[in-house]
């Protein structure tokens, strides 16, 4: 299964894996799954770090690769979906992850209940 992980799932997987449910940890560890960290997540982390909302002392691209995660670029097809998406969720980064999920037909691993209001699968 191909899965996009939300930003908080990425951070928890790296630093606080016990915050993840057993099912989520199992899915992340299952070698038959391809787990994606979006370039949107990388941008979100860097922007939050630059304005002092988050302290990051690691390179998230390198850490994603070291952890066995693949990177998923935000593409034009996903960007075009943003125009028609309802504003159930106001966070622009989450909206872009939702658009990627819809464009690629990959589920999103998240604890954010607002994401389930969109026509994407949530795990």
Locate the predicted segments by residue:
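Short, well-structured N-terminal submotif of metal-dependent ribonuclease cores
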Residues: 1-37, 51-62, 104, 113
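A generic structural signal for short hydrophobic patches within well-formed alpha-helices
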Residues: 10, 42, 79, 115-116
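Residue-level signal for well-ordered alpha-helical positions
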Residues: 16-17, 48, 85, 121
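Short glycine/serine/threonine-enriched helix-capping/active-site loop
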Residues: 37-38, 74
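Active-site neighborhoods of divalent-metal-dependent phosphate/nucleic-acid chemistry enzymes
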Residues: 57, 69-111, 120-123
């Amino acid at each position: 299964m191909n899965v996009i992980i939300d930003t908080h799932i990425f951070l928890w997987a790296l630093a606080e894996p016990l915050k993840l449910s057993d099912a989520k940890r199992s899915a992340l560890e299952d070698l038959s799954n391809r787990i994606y960290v979006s370039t949107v997540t990388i941008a979100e982390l860097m922007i939050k770090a630059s304005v002092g909302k988050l302290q990051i002392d690691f390179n998230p691209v390198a850490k994603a690769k070291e952890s066995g995660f693949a990177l998923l670029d935000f593409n034009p097809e996903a960007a075009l979906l943003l125009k028609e998406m309802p504003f159930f969720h106001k966070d622009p980064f989450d909206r872009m992850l939702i658009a990627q999920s819809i464009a690629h037909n990959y589920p999103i691993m998240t604890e954010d209940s607002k994401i389930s209001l969109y026509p994407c699968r949530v795990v």
